[in-house]
Each structure stands twice: as structure tokens, then as C-alpha cells.
């Protein structure tokens, strides 16, 4: 990143050159604006890596583990030569696991493969076995599945939904590099894995995107109908985040969700904090106004970008939406 200099709309002139000229293509601009993959907080081991004589995780004190017990369909073998339903999850201390081994044993992990030939780390959390709905959760830009695992268990148990999630290319155990094209290929692979491996039909899938995760969520929802869509702190487009005065989508813009949201035919709940310091509240408002099937939104007064979940109305609104406002609730 260049040294600070004179600033324009929150960016120095040096930063503007770095952003748009090295090289000036949407995928590179997108990567510079949006992707902050952390050091992986977990590993996924195949059966042969856990057999006699195989190396153990770093230490019992620094890791927790869960066996992935799901039995997938025969046509969905594990990537990397592992047998179906046999991988195990090992979390590092940085994953900040908040539950017992019993809850961790309910977490299933496996690999899928994207159309762009990246290996995709996937996670299925059985929070509510009798629940009708499963959330396909696309997380934010600076976390991985290990860090999100505890949150998924807490959220799913409170809203009575199972949760399926995945790491973007270049995040966690997923191969490749983060990019806009990979985002779309990643969620396509996750959607197909949820449907074929677990037999979840589209009318029982709720797409949930948070922050950068709203980008693949909107893209998928504009192409497939599902039970519902939840957009948590969405962005209109990459340029509109960097330059708030942008009024139209340019050819070199990235993540143009504002141009896709009108094609979403499923019910959409938009959630945004009024004091969001990363993606301005105006983004959530614009997405809500452009969405043809938007339900009553949740504007969390005083909330920022990373603390909406701490407000009581967050869970209350999710429960109301899922339990009472969906067509087949």
C-alpha cells in the first residue's frame, strides 16, 4: 500500500493510482478493495491423515476436533481421494471455539470443486435436525470457517435452522485466489453441494450473505429462486463503497449487486446498521428500495459494521421473518 498523501473521497492520490492502475481491471480492483483472508484457523484431515502413525493436530490444548459423520451420495466423493463423509475438523486457538466437543461433533466438513477448478472447503452445521430450512451462509471478508463455526452453532440453534457455509477461494482450506469470478463460482459449487449431498431443495434454502458475502448471495439469488434471501450489511458495488458519490455502474466497477437485486424473485430481508463505518447505511437502503420482493427491513440504530448481531432486534427479526413471513412457514 502506498504512503499517505493528499486524499480524495477517503483515498490518497497514491492509493488511487495503486487501486486503478496496477493493473486497471475490475478483478484486481475488487481484490484490493474487498478481500482480507486471515491466516487459516482450522485444518481438515482426510481419513488416511488420521490413521495409525499419522501426525496429530498441533496439541490437545490448542485444537478441537470434530468427525464429519454425514454420508453423502455416492456421486459426491471427497476431493483429494478421501472417502465420503470421513473428514475431520481441527480448530486452532484463534478460532475461539465457545462450545463443547458434543457441539463440535455436529459439524461436518468436506471438500467440493468449483467450475473454476478450485477446491472448496465446506461446512454443514446440524443445529436443528427437524428444521425445514437451511441457511446457505456467505461470510464476511476477514474471517474463515474456523472463526465462524461457533457463531453458526449459536445462530442456528436460536433461529431453528441448519447452516451450510463455505470458504471463498483463497480462504481457509479453499485453494485458489480470491476474486470476483471465483466468488460466483464458489457459491455455485456450495449451492450444488447443499442440494446434491444433503438433498435440500431450493424451497428450503435461505441464502444469507454478510458484507462481501452479499455479493455472491445476490448473484445466485438473481439466477435461482429459493425460500428467502437475507442481506446483512450489503453493498451496492465496489466503486460505490470506495467513492460514495458514484451514481452509476461503470464498466470497470466490481460487485455490481445494485444492478442484480431487481432480478431477485425470492423474499428479501435487508439488515444494516445506521452507523456502519465500512459500508455506509445508504447501501442497505438503496438495495432495499431496488428489491421487488423486499420485506420490512431491519435498520439497527447505532450499530456499526461488525456488531449488529449483539443487538436483541437482530435475532428477533430473523425469527419473525423465518417463522412467520415466509410463504410456507
From Swiss-Prot:
Compartments in which it is found: Recycling endosome membrane; Cell projection, Dendritic spine; Postsynaptic density membrane
Entry's Gene Ontology BP terms: negative regulation of protein localization to microtubule; positive regulation of protein localization to endosome; regulation of postsynapse organization
PTM field: Palmitoylated on cysteine residues located in a cysteine cluster at the N-terminus which promotes membrane localization. Palmitoylation is required for post-synaptic localization and for depalmitoylating activity towards DLG4/PSD95.
Biased amino acid composition, Low complexity: 51-79
Sections of the chain in a coiled coil: none
Pfam families: Hydrolase_4 (PF12146)
Gene3D superfamilies per UniProt: alpha/beta hydrolase (3.40.50.1820)
Active site: 211, 276, 305
GO molecular function annotations of the record: palmitoyl-(protein) hydrolase activity
Keywords on record: Cell membrane, Cell projection, Endosome, Hydrolase, Lipoprotein, Membrane, Palmitate, Postsynaptic cell membrane, Synapse
Membrane topology: Lipid-anchor
One Gene Ontology cellular component annotation held by this UniProt entry: recycling endosome membrane
Keyword check for Hydrolase: yes
Annotated region described as Disordered, given as residue ranges: 46-85
Function: Hydrolyzes fatty acids from S-acylated cysteine residues in proteins. Has depalmitoylating activity towards NRAS and DLG4/PSD95.
Similarity annotation: Belongs to the AB hydrolase superfamily. ABHD17 family.
Protein name: Alpha/beta hydrolase domain-containing protein 17C
